[in-house]
Amino acid sequence: MNQAIEAVAGAQEAPHVAAGQSADAEALRAAFQRQRQAYLSDPIPDLAQRRKDLLTLKRLLSENVDQVIAAICEDYGNRSRHETLFAEIITVTDGINDTVRHLKKWMKPQRRHVDRTLYPGARNRLIPQPLGVTGLIIPWNFPVNLAFSQLTGAFAAGNRAMVKLSENSMALAALLKELSPSYFPPEKLAWFEETGGVGIEFSKIPFDLLVFTGSGQTGRAVMAAAAHNLTPVVLELGGKSPAIIDPEYPLKKAVERILFVKQFNAGQICTNVDYAFVHESQRDEFIGQARQYVARHCPDINNADYTSIIDDRSYRRLEETLDDARGKGATVINLSGDQPGNRDQRKFPLHLVLDTTANMTIRSRETFGPILCIQKVADEEEAIRLANDSEFGLNGNVWTRDKSRGYQLATAIDT
């Protein structure tokens, strides 16, 4: 998807389908026009219709759980069934239930302050209304979670949606395209896979709102394409995520919680911890606790519960990241001991990287895998300074029992 959309950055053409454009572009435009006309015919669905749409969305997922899990596993090569159930199924259905419970309240008009100097005697109301047709560009790492949670918001607000999945989610895209017509008409919900040109054309469509989740580089291209139509764009981009561990906090607990998420989905989570700042007196203990955690919880990466890296390119990127760090003086520790990575199955062991420097790739690029930098620090001030030494801040974690101090540290992290 990244390579396909990258070409959009310089596009200046109006978003119409010329004679030489692909069938993909024509299909996208036809789907958009169908949804646009349906929206104009019924612009503000009532509470009953929105609840029906949300519960239908829930049925689409809950009635096809095994097929969805199998499709995601096929796309990954191997995806832990337990991880898919938790991250893609349970959380989504719970979110839909919560939205249904609160929807009536959220739809109510809201009062706002009126400047009586400019508008003497006036009253006002803010009335929530649908935008129209929304476009959702979904990444491969949690495709159901991100697609269905965004659809939950779109349908709750009374919108229609076109969803484009990643080129790494082809099996899931095929399944959802097959299942969806039994639950929603195409003028309400339409799915598209990435075939090499869809991303370009999708970003050109004059949606009422376009939501993109992915890399900053691709996000710039998406925004540039959408700008021609003045399409509002919401970007959820990647970045670096530090963790600061208070020396007074139980180190074993911090290690277990950080590594649980680091190995979840093989670390392919945008908000995952990239590097942990540990007091210099505790670094060796951190390493020891990390070894014990892996020995207990994921001793064999070839187990079906250990998720694969999504594709060969990503696997090579992780290898190159470690090679770059080693070549520039870092110490790399394979927490699986003598068990190397499995290239055929794209199983990558958890690694710790020590003594990193600013010129290493791992310090300037989102890791997006089971690699964790450990940086020893003398105090919290040094931890904050190093944590903020990046323009790519996305998320931050503070492990402490002192809530007041934790809040101060969290607000000091530039994310």
Predicted regions and their residues:
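Conserved C-terminal structural/oligomerization subdomain of aldehyde/semialdehyde dehydrogenase
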Residues: 2, 37, 46-51, 244, ...
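N-terminal Rossmann-like NAD(P)+-binding subdomain of aldehyde/semialdehyde dehydrogenases
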Residues: 2-124
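ALDH superfamily catalytic-core signature
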Residues: 10, 217-357
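Residues at or immediately preceding the N-termini of alpha-helices
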Residues: 25-28, 47, 65, 251, ...
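Structural signal for hydrophobic packing residues in well-ordered secondary-structure cores
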Residues: 39, 43, 58-61, 65, ...
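Hydrophobic packing residues within well-ordered alpha-helices of enzyme cores
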Residues: 72, 173-176, 202, 222, ...
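Rossmann-like NAD(P) dinucleotide-binding subdomain of oxidoreductase/dehydrogenase enzymes
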Residues: 115-253, 377
